[in-house]
Amino acid sequence: MEHPLNIYNTLTRKKEQFIPLHEPHVGMYVCGPTVYGDAHLGHARPAITFDLLFRYLTHLGYKVRYVRNITDVGHLEHDADDGEDKIAKKARLEQLEPMEVVQYYLNRYHQAMDALNVLPPSIEPHASGHIIEQIELVKKILDNGYAYESQGSVYFDVEKYNKDHKYGILSGRNIEDMLNTTRALDGQDEKHNAIDFALWKCAQPEHIMRWPSPWSDGFPGWHCECTAMGKKYLGEHFDIHGGGMDLIFPHHECEIAQAVASQGDDMVHYWMHNNMITINGQKMGKSLGNFITLEQFFTGDHPSLQQAYSAMTIRFFILQAHYRSTVDFSNEALQAAEKGLSRLMEAYGHLMKLQPSATSTVDTKGLREKCFEAMNDDLNSPIVISHLFDATRAINSVKDGKATLSEEDLKELQEVFHLFLFDILGMKDEASASGNHYEAFGKAVDLLLSIRQQAKANKDWATSDKIRNELTAMGFEIKDTKDGAEWKLSK
């Protein structure tokens, strides 16, 4: 490829050049949501992070098969091996079938992802649709001697596995420390060690979600689904596995152990993890009850929110930080993101209307290369955005008549701005995204301003002022320029 991409591999703890196993094909698996409630800001971050990667790999010419799963069974409370299934609990509380809960929140998740301009994955498999594959995985691990059956459940034997391999290779945790510090919880005396994790759980009589297996009527452990579905759709070895940093342990650590125990080696070449969204310094999440849903951001209906924020403001807010750095929620940061995005969108609008000159007095030639350089440095989206802001200053100088752009440079700047702002960063002009209604609405405002312009030419100041004052009262900002009046909706 013309542009070598380097990404940070959590497994090796360093940036590495991305070399696909089967170029030009790329296999990418990302852990999706457990659908028992509305998506919140913490769900938006991995979705947007790996959407950025998906878009960029596609732009570089790779043929990406992007698999993002839906967890609809087996994810117990507190991410543990005991307690109630999160979806079954929600179903019981709302007196619904578990799959009604799944479908309702999955529909709402998709709506939120559409609003955030997150592209759909190539495949979106459900854990409940792959029980057979998970049972086969458990059988292989048992046959290879790294699991044991106990009272109808099957557990992964971490201590035995660690004698032949290395448990903790991803998270850097030491098994001796874990053996000494992990306490056995009530109801887990069927395990050899407290750190052993469930591959299959025997269902209690009241447990609704259950399937027959060689060991009992039950359900798979949470960690099995990604190993089984990753293998089914991407093969025994694939390029990228992504997810939030909170999944490194235990979920992804257990996935590596399952893969090695079942087939002799890890399935994944590059492990990638986005950092957390925090609120008052704590991870935002359902389990802590400190989350704000995306719907609440879009409507402003939450006591912590000073206003509503658009989906593109949320996306821009997340992309303004590098995906491996923490992002702390605040109204001030979101309002700054809103203003910054508005500046870029306005600049793009001006850019598309600029007229070329014979020569250029501003240098735009390095912009494309600088943006690619930032993206190739582990998807450094904040640096890309800073380069676009630099270009915005040049655009405004040309617009104000203080600088010029040749036809060639103008075309290059238009192409690069569009490529990075829309195609790669995945932003969209929310005003124009509403389609024909907005177009008709815009034409109506333009018509009023042309009538005002004619009134000014006729020295009919009363009509001119009336149109301006009425539009201002409705929330429009009117700016008179040498080329006529410009307008935008003010906040």
From Swiss-Prot:
Its cofactor is Zn(2+). Zn(2+) binds at residues 31, 226, 251, 255. Its EC number is 6.1.1.16. Its main location: cytoplasm. The keyword Membrane does not apply. Gene3D superfamilies: Cysteine-tRNA ligase, C-terminal anti-codon recognition domain (1.20.120.1910), HUPs (3.40.50.620). Keywords: Aminoacyl-tRNA synthetase, ATP-binding, Cytoplasm, Ligase, Metal-binding, Nucleotide-binding, Protein biosynthesis, Zinc. Transmembrane segments: none annotated. ATP binds at residue 286. A motif ('HIGH' region) lies at residues 33-43. One of its GO terms (cellular component) is cytosol. One of its GO terms (biological process) is cysteinyl-tRNA aminoacylation. CDD domains: CysRS_core (cd00672). A motif ('KMSKS' region) lies at residues 283-287. It is an enzyme of class 6 (ligase). Monomer. Belongs to the class-I aminoacyl-tRNA synthetase family. This is Cysteine--tRNA ligase. It comes from Parabacteroides distasonis (strain ATCC 8503 / DSM 20701 / CIP 104284 / JCM 5825 / NCTC 11152). The gene is cysS.
